[in-house]
Swiss-Prot record:
Located at the top of the head of the 30S subunit, it contacts several helices of the 16S rRNA. In the 70S ribosome it contacts the 23S rRNA (bridge B1a) and protein L5 of the 50S subunit (bridge B1b), connecting the 2 subunits; these bridges are implicated in subunit movement. This is Small ribosomal subunit protein uS13. The gene is rps13. Belongs to the universal ribosomal protein uS13 family. Residues 160-171 have a biased composition (Acidic residues).
Amino acid sequence: MSSEEQEDVDEDIQYFVRIGQTDLDGTKTVERALAELGGVGRRVARIVADEAGVDRTATMGGLEDDAIESVTDAVDSFTEHAPAWLANRQNDFYTGENQHITGTDVELTRDQDINRMRMIRSYKGIRHERGQKVRGQRTKSTGRTEGTIGVNVEAIKEEQAEDDAADGGEE
């Protein structure tokens, strides 16, 4: 491929593709670009690309506008054509439906769930409030946020060196 053909290809690429309130890198493949979207990993991206009828190894920015729209529609309607066990929000608390949340909604939904647990004073909510581990991990020796535990050898050596210097100067 000559340099002129390479420049023509680069001019046709959209460097940013907007899907689900997120700018995706148009220079990456469809599968890898979709994986940057919150709530979409490599496996879900592969399923979405196949459902949209797009080659998942094609460059995301090189797709036509109608292909990008079909990818967007496939992301939005993921739960309709994917198995229920693949949804990231199964049996939603409020609706009882299986949903697949993408983009910034993932973090917002997570925060709402944590706040709901805090309000009803569940065990997990109390652990979240206190900043402690929630999922049953050990806390005796890991996850400490305060200063160092035990003997600080460097500080002791510095104090001894200062004491020795002070004692040596007085004699």
